[in-house]
Regions:
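Conserved N-terminal ligand/cofactor-binding loop architecture of enzyme catalytic domains
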Residues: 1-53
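C-terminal "capping" alpha-helix adjacent to the active site of nucleotide-linked donor transferases
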Residues: 267-269, 276-293
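A short alpha->beta transition loop at the rim of the catalytic pocket in nucleotide-sugar-dependent
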Residues: 226-227, 245-247
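Acidic donor-binding loop of glycosyltransferase active sites
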Residues: 224-234
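Donor-nucleotide binding loops and adjacent catalytic segments primarily
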Residues: 143-144, 151-225
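A nucleotide-sugar donor-handling region in carbohydrate enzymes
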Residues: 102-164
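A short, well-ordered alpha-helix in the C-terminal region of glycosyltransferases
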Residues: 293-307
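C-terminal alpha-helical cap of glycosyltransferases
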Residues: 306-322
Length: 322
């Protein structure tokens, strides 16, 4: 239910989502709990009943809402297993500070001052990074990834995605990149996710001139096959891209946490930030077709997303059980 509301909101009116996010930023300055906290209070009894039937050694939550439920349970005197909140954006999102998980895993040590600013105790903060799955794809060549996807191993591909819901400006982005493609002998792969309307419109306009993909569970292969990845700056999806060591261009951020993700990746050199695709996107693509720029960006990705977060989170869980 929450996912559907979120996806519908950002698909149809990302500006409204940005306004709601800014309201959250303002509300967090007030000296009392947020409506989000009180709404999730009703879920405390449901989670308590679930845990009685399905005992757990530890709860790991990458989302604010379960963290709010756990906080309510603690304040209501309910028994709760050790809990770990994993922040999946490169920012301390509104109301994180009112949660009371035992540990808080954050994407980078560079974000410690921001989380401390909002009152998260330093001893709770673990800058381990955002965990990503080991898919095994990193051990195959780009050519093999292309073959497994039914693509031409000899061709270069520009990979575009808008997250699971697509993004409003993606048609414009495809049009811009299609012109770049025609100049540089590469082909576009457009991952539309669950946005069937976008898929249909692009299929009608471009037919077989670009590779169109709907929802897919083969994103790691596409990241391996692509030469450059153009996408919205989601926290987890951008981390997965950086872990795949693919040159990255951020576009069309949803105002709020995605804007902050874009800023972090730009500042650390892990991605280029394009705020005006018409004026900036072509130059960004051409820049990342230069080998020295690609190499420099991948080195930054290796520095800030070393790929150790999942193992370190597992170690933190084991230590907490002792």
């Amino acid at each position: 239910m929450i996912d559907k509301v979120y996806i519908g909101l950002v698909q149809k009116n990302s500006t409204l989502f940005g306004f709601v996010y800014r309201l959250g930023e303002l509300y967090r300055r007030l000296p009392f709990p947020s409506p989000v906290y009180y709404i999730n209070r009703k879920m405390a009894y449901i989670l308590q009943e679930y845990l009685l039937r399905h005992p757990a050694d530890v709860i790991i939550t990458p989302h604010l809402y379960p963290a709010e439920i756990i906080t309510n349970m603690k304040k209501m005197g309910m028994e709760v297993p050790p809990s770990i909140f994993v922040a999946t954006d490169y920012a301390c999102i509104p109301f994180t500070e009112e949660t009371d998980c035992d540990d808080v895993v954050i994407p980078s040590e560079k974000l410690i001052p921001e989380f401390r600013k909002y009152g998260i105790p330093k001893e709770k903060l673990y800058p381990l990074g955002i965990p990503t799955a080991d898919t095994g794809v990193e051990r195959i060549s780009p050519e093999e990834a292309k073959r497994q996807l039914g693509l031409d191993p000899a061709k270069e591909y520009l990979l575009i995605a808008g997250g699971s819901m697509g993004a409003g400006a993606l048609e414009e982005v495809v049009e811009i990149l299609y012109r770049v493609r025609s100049l540089h002998k590469c082909k576009l792969i457009m991952v539309c996710g669950n946005n069937q309307q976008l898929y249909s419109r692009l299929q009608k306009r471009y037919a077989d001139k670009i590779e169109l993909v709907g929802y897919t569970d083969k994103m790691p292969l596409y990241l391996k096959a692509g030469s450059i990845f153009i996408t919205k700056p989601g926290g987890l999806s951008s981390t997965e891209a950086a872990a795949a060591r693919i040159p990255l261009i951020h576009i069309c951020p949803i105002p709020g946490c995605e804007t902050k993700n874009m800023q972090f990746f730009k500042k650390t050199g892990m991605a280029l930030a394009v705020t005006n695709p018409k004026e900036e996107l072509t130059a960004a693509v051409l820049s990342l077709q230069k080998q020295e720029n690609r190499k420099k960006m991948i080195q930054c990705q290796e520095k800030y997303v070393p790929g150790t977060a999942t193992a370190q989170l597992g170690q933190l869980v084991e230590e907490g059980k002792k």
